[in-house]
Amino acid sequence: MKSVQGKTVLITGAAMGMGRLFAERAIAEKAKAVVLWDLNEAALQRTLEELTGRGTDVTAYLVDVGDLAAVEASAAAVLAEVGAVDVLVNNAGVVRGNQYFWESDSARDTRLTVAVNTLAPMYVARAFLPGMIAGPGEARLLNLASAAGFTANPRMAVYAASKWAVIGWSDSVRLELKQAGVEHVKVTTVCPYYVNTGMFDGAKSAPLLPILEPAHVVDEAWRAMCAGGSFVVLPRTVMLSEVLKGLVPIGVRDFISDNVIGVYHTMEDFTGRVEQQA
């Protein structure tokens, strides 16, 4: 697939940050329709107004993607009002950090993080994948995971767990589609380090792990998605943690991750932008 021209694209967490950039990219490529999902009503309305009138039909839905009933109802509305979705970008996410796990609030922190980061992409994909599979044209599922899904990291235990789960689920769906002989639907899993969207305000860069600019992440993710690529890991030095897991004892890995790569103290000054989409 060279571009999304003529296709219908749905993006979660679309009101700001990378979600909005994905929407702008789809419009620039002359998508037939772009559907924006978000829970921030004011930002969603503002983005809708600013993206309307650029040659693509843009619609917005106020959706709590962590609520299964809300996802199913909104998906039914999209299918009835807009039509089948060709490209689904699971971008919505939250991060709660700067606490040790035992200091966190199970209802406010753990439940929210798992609902939005882990369950939501599954709910949304389940709602639209059957139509993508049944459709005649090329289709894409782009899932935003995180570099945190590859390595343990202090002060973000639940976030890391939520992204580990997304990576396992997303790549398993890729394999299921392949095993089922569905050649026209491709799944791409994107795993960036901290992205400069405001969501990770206060998080530190590390010697081998710079804070990433959202436009760069969106460009790399979009290019891989269109090409049908399986994984995008940014920066590539993130994969050092995977290499270390298989080569050295855990104590040595911890020492290198802490003192050489420098990742274990990156969340100490985290403030974040609570309950905002990525």
What is each stretch, according to the model?
Residues 146:
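Residue(s) in the substrate-gating loop at a strand-loop-helix junction
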Residues 95-111, 155:
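Conserved mid-core segment of classical short-chain dehydrogenase/reductases
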Residues 2-35:
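Canonical Rossmann dinucleotide-binding motif of NAD(H)/NADP(H)-dependent dehydrogenases/reductases
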Residues 125, 162:
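Active-site helix of classical SDR
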Residues 41-42, 61-74, 107:
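The beta1-alpha1 cofactor-binding region of Rossmann-like NAD(H)/NADP(H)-dependent oxidoreductases
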Residues 31-47:
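Conserved glycine-rich Rossmann-like NAD(P)H-binding loop of the short-chain dehydrogenase/reductase
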